[in-house]
């Protein structure tokens, strides 16, 4: 502890560059272990020094400071500690504003590490509303973040910005985040949709699919999702589609974007993501109107072929079961189902509902680790 405390004096903005760099390199190494993180988190003056060095004129020093924050915010309790201390300082260290500013700065060398810090902070559900307050303070911030995510060459210093996907996914943990994502004012969801099939990054793809699942769990948005002018259903189905040929009769049911797919078309390779997509469809089966729309758009036909592929190629039992859960509903006549709304007429035990949320949160976290 004393050794860590002694480093603080060398991490002041006006200190010699070589001393700052050596001290911060040591601190960054400490953040890689649970013991080191505990020691640093117990010293407010050390955290304050790290905050200050994120603004250092030397890019290597600034980057090491931000990388330290990534490690220090990787667990919920620690993330809360960092967030609260940053807020309590006089003047405050505006960690969310700084992150958003760096992410949306096309010339920033630190956009990727700052996006990972913000991803860690937004993962903590108890912080999401306060983070949204900050992001909404300026009407331009959310649209700029969406633009930075949607435009692959946005950052001129070659930052990938893949972690914006889990940031948006984390924000949609809460109803306010889902509302913002679906609101016409920002049209965030439409900008994010293409990346549900993005082959270049499982983090970007997984975060986008997580957004879709969070929105699908909220029946308020089912009409938006299933609107004929919306591309959301296509974004959910496309990763589940393969190169199989359909009869003309079946093809007429499918959305035009999913008709006559090329022989090179492949399905989502990650079984956890396939399962999340299938769970999206299961949630969309909650009302009679939604079920009828799904049937009319060839969802059963797509899942019929998908099930054959999963049984022979994918071979994931959880995905097979998730597919069968949807198919079992779609093949039934409404008279057999006898319910207009599964969610209001069939009560899901609270502990089971909580388990679903925890499992999904754990999976998204596994993508980031």
UniProtKB/Swiss-Prot annotation:
Cross-referenced Pfam families: DUF383 (PF04063), DUF384 (PF04064)
**Recorded superkingdom:** Eukaryota
The protein's matches in PANTHER family, at most eight in alphabetical order, are given as: PROTEIN HGH1 HOMOLOG
Belongs to which family?
Belongs to the HGH1 family.
What protein name applies here? Protein HGH1 homolog
| Taxonomic source organism | Drosophila melanogaster (Fruit fly)
Q: What is the lineage of its organism?
A: Eukaryota, Metazoa, Ecdysozoa, Arthropoda, Hexapoda
């Amino acid at each position: 502890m004393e050794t860590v405390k002694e480093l603080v004096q060398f991490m002041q903005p006006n200190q010699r560059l070589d001393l700052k760099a050596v001290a911060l390199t040591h601190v960054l190494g400490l953040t890689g272990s649970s013991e080191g993180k505990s020691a640093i988190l117990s010293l407010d003056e050390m955290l304050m020094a790290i905050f200050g060095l994120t603004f250092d004129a030397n890019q290597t020093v600034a980057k090491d400071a931000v990388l330290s924050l990534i490690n220090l915010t990787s667990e919920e309790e620690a993330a809360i500690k960092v967030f609260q201390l940053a807020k309590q300082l006089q003047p405050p260290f505006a960690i969310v504003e700084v992150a958003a500013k760096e992410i949306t700065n096309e010339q920033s060398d630190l956009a990727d590490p700052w996006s990972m810090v913000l991803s860690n902070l937004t993962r903590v559900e108890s912080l999401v509303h306060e983070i949204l307050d900050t992001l909404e303070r300026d009407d331009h911030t959310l649209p700029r973040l969406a633009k930075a995510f949607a435009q692959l060459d946005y950052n001129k210093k070659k930052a990938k910005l893949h972690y914006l996907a889990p940031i948006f996914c984390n924000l949609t943990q809460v109803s306010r985040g889902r509302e913002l994502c679906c609101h016409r004012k920002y049209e965030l969801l439409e900008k994010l949709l293409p990346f549900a099939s993005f082959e270049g990054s499982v983090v970007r793809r997984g975060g986008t699919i997580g957004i879709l699942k969070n929105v699908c769990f909220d029946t308020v948005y089912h009409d938006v999702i299933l609107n004929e002018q919306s591309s959301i259903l296509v974004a959910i189905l496309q990763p589940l589609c393969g190169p199989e040929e359909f009869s003309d009769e079946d093809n007429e049911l499918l959305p035009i974007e999913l008709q006559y797919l090329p022989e090179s078309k492949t399905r989502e390779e990650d079984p956890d993501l396939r399962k999340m997509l299938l769970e999206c469809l299961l949630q969309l089966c909650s009302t009679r109107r939604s079920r009828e729309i799904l049937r009319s758009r060839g969802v059963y036909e797509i899942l019929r072929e998908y099930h054959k592929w999963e049984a022979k190629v994918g071979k994931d039992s959880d995905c097979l079961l998730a597919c069968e859960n949807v198919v079992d509903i779609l093949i039934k006549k409404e008279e057999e189902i006898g319910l207009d709304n599964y969610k209001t007429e069939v009560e899901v035990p609270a502990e089971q509902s909580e388990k679903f949320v925890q499992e999904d949160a754990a999976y998204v976290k596994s993508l980031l680790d």
